[in-house]
């Protein structure tokens, strides 16, 4: 069935007059047709470097990934922001499920597409992942040698969260078994009911009289206000399928991250609750040993603010930034450093 693509500009960010934009589609190796926004710098000539962008987890290309893609197109790159399989305007049934394997393939399919564009230099392709898709991007970098530079912004390691909970607070055999029982009971109910239950997105209204962690308030401020709300975003609406991430509970991310030879930059906010996931991924990838450990809960704060380099790998901790600041805050996202890192390594 043909994808239904909107013709209107329905992004949560203004349209740039410095780039050309159009909708494109392409298929991954699982036969799922993906929808993407293609951004090209105006009046450019010759073969250009290119970037594929996706994320955050539960978002659509009209949100943060499109914001990044348009910004990088203004800087001279051909870019696409794509909806992963089963989400947004992309194909795939059932809806609102995730698969580590299929989502890595989504990135590879985006590289396939870019490699075959007349105005793209296939030897100068990079990828950017945001939030949960930063983790997918890093995993893709382990398998796809065509990717010359990978940018992981405000990373979530989704399999780790699904398996061990936040800050590994559920990292026990007993806790994992409880979650497995719950998700498999939900599968039974889904089959009986003929549809997959959705677990709910970010609450529409913040509860009164309840002191929520700052990161939950930040998610609400992005997904449920005009700043970032989008009608096709699962986070802005009814969320992921409750049993749709079963396979993530049986997956260990970044098993071969130490074998990545091409360049990787991991960017994270100093104040982000999720910071430990980027710090740990950088250590797994490079073997880096942190000199400090002032982590309160129990991880955040191992790496110094600023740049940590190991060859062509970099961890950049952005001073004062939260997790969601790196979704769309142009004065906080280090676009100049991202651009310089990519151009240095392609």
Can you say where each PLM-predicted feature lies in the sequence?
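N-terminal cap/lid segment of alpha/beta-hydrolase-fold proteins
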Residues: 3-46, 327
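Short beta-strand element of the alpha/beta-hydrolase
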Residues: 47-56
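The serine-hydrolase catalytic nucleophile loop
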Residues: 58-70, 84
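Catalytic nucleophile-loop/oxyanion-hole region of alpha/beta-hydrolase
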Residues: 61, 87-122, 328-334
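Conserved alpha/beta-hydrolase
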Residues: 71-91
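Alpha/beta-hydrolase-fold enzymes
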Residues: 138-225
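Short beta-strand/loop motif that positions the catalytic acidic residue
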Residues: 260, 266-268
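Catalytic active-site module of serine/aspartate enzymes centered on a nucleophile-bearing elbow/loop
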Residues: 319-324, 328-346
């Amino acid at each position: 069935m043909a994808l239904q693509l909107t013709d209107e500009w329905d992004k949560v960010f203004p349209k740039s007059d410095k780039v050309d934009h159009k909708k494109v589609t392409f298929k991954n190796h699982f036969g799922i047709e993906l929808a993407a926004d293609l951004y090209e710098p105006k009046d450019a000539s010759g073969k250009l470097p290119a970037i594929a962008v996706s994320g955050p987890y539960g978002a659509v290309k009209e949100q943060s990934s499109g914001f990044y893609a348009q910004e990088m197109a203004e800087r001279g790159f051909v870019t696409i922001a794509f909806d992963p399989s089963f989400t947004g305007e992309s194909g795939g049934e059932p809806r609102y499920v995730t698969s580590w394997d299929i989502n890595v393939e989504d990135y590879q399919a985006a590289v396939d597409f870019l490699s075959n564009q007349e105005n793209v230099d296939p030897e100068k392709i990079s990828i950017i992942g945001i939030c949960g898709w930063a983790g997918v991007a890093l995993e893709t970098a382990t398998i796809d040698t065509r990717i010359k530079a990978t940018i992981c912004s405000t990373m979530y390691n989704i399999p780790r969260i699904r398996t061990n909970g936040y800050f590994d607070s559920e990292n026990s055999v007993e806790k994992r078994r409880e979650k497995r029982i719950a998700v498999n009971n939900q599968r039974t109910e889904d089959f009986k009911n003929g549809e997959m239950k959705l677990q709910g997105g970010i609450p529409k209204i913040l509860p009164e009289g309840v002191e929520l962690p700052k990161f939950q308030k930040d998610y609400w401020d992005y997904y449920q206000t005009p700043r970032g709300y989008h009608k096709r975003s699962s986070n802005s609406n009814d969320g992921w399928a409750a049993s749709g991430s079963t396979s993530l509970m049986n997956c260990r991310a970044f098993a071969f991250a130490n074998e990545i030879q091409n360049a990787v930059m991991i960017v994270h906010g100093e104040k982000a609750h999720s910071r430990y996931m980027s710090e740990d991924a950088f250590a797994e990838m490079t073997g880096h040993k942190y000199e400090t450990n002032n982590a309160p809960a129990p991880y955040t704060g191992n790496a110094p603010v600023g740049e940590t380099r190991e060859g062509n790998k970099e961890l950049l901790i952005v001073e004062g930034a939260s997790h969601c600041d790196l979704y769309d805050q142009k004065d906080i996202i280090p676009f100049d450093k991202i651009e310089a890192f990519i151009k240095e390594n392609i």
